[in-house]
Amino acid sequence: MKKEDLRIVYMGTPDFAVEALRQLVEGGYNVVGVITMPDKPAGRGHKIQYSPVKQYALEQNLPLLQPEKLKDEAFVQALREWKADLQIVVAFRMLPEVVWNMPRLGTFNLHASLLPQYRGAAPINWAVINGDTETGITTFFLQHEIDTGKVIQQVRVPIADTDNVEVVHDKLMILGGKLVLETVDAILNDTVKPIAQEDMAVVGELRPAPKIFKETCRIDWNSPVKKVYDFIRGLSPYPAAWSELVSPEGEAVVMKIFESEKIYEAHQLPVGTVVTDGKKYIKVAVPDGFVSVLSLQLPGKKRLKTDELLRGFRLSDGYKMN
């Protein structure tokens, strides 16, 4: 079968999912339909906002479905009428069997980790938070349990000590697009040899990648320098690590922290103590040193570098982070 004859249905929603779709379209593959999340109001004006995948699909005049429920009979029938040979899922949602089992060649997913590591909703964040020096991208066939299907292909990607989650996300997004094409070609040429995840060699324990909530993002200043540093970059720029900045009078304000620096220095200060010159730097005491805050944001304000914030916000010794 030629690639032009292979009928592909593509499912995805955020920016991360646009790259693979773009590479499929520009590569001359036959994308017969796109499925994305329903439109949602966003921002202060609650204006209806299209998902990045929908925006791209409209630009390319691709047929589009936006089901509220994936088991809805009308949606399932519309999907069936596209007569897909293969379905590709990138950053979408959990599919019911009636959907993933429909195409004759199956449905494969692009997952932003080296499965079986980091199964779950936030694999890129957790790899950086945990201080990993390597992650990767995986294509695998869908089956009943989430992120457990047979692995088709993987690509490894280094994580630099200075990388935040945005940098790693963008690396994986580009490589993921290429891997989707390679996986489609392997399926077309019947050269796929899927490997069960339980048969794959794993170094160390399996780590999950659960969804991240606001409380997940609160900084624990009782952690070592390196752990706090990794935590901040693993949540930067979104959803952002945060802490309560408490004044000597006991007034607290939530502060988001986007960028930091490690300082290994012995001290006798209580954990969470803020050390500042009021002009250039803010350091927070942790058990084995300090975390220097380089970029931050106060409620209702824009993100600023520390010296910019200190020009308009009076901060002195006596403050602490909670």
UniProtKB/Swiss-Prot annotation:
Catalytic activity from the UniProt record: L-methionyl-tRNA(fMet) + (6R)-10-formyltetrahydrofolate = N-formyl-L-methionyl-tRNA(fMet) + (6S)-5,6,7,8-tetrahydrofolate + H(+)
UniProt GO MF annotations: methionyl-tRNA formyltransferase activity
GO biological process, one term: conversion of methionyl-tRNA to N-formyl-methionyl-tRNA
EC number: 2.1.2.9
Pfam families per the UniProt record, alphabetical: Formyl_trans_C, Formyl_trans_N
A cellular component annotation (GO) from this entry: cytosol
Class in the EC hierarchy, top level: transferase
SUPFAM superfamilies: FMT C-terminal domain-like, Formyltransferase
Binding site for (6S)-5,6,7,8-tetrahydrofolate: S113, L114, L115, P116
Key words of the record: Protein biosynthesis, Transferase
InterPro entries xref list: Fmt, Formyl_trans_C, Formyl_trans_C_sf, Formyl_transf_N, Formyl_transf_N_sf, Formyl_transferase-like_C_sf, Met-tRNA-FMT_C, Met-tRNA-FMT_N
HAMAP family in UniProt: Formyl_trans
Similarity comment: family membership: Belongs to the Fmt family.
Functional description taken from the UniProt entry: Attaches a formyl group to the free amino group of methionyl-tRNA(fMet). The formyl group appears to play a dual role in the initiator identity of N-formylmethionyl-tRNA by promoting its recognition by IF2 and preventing the misappropriation of this tRNA by the elongation apparatus.
Protein name: Methionyl-tRNA formyltransferase
Species name: Bacteroides thetaiotaomicron (strain ATCC 29148 / DSM 2079 / JCM 5827 / CCUG 10774 / NCTC 10582 / VPI-5482 / E50)
Gene behind this protein: fmt
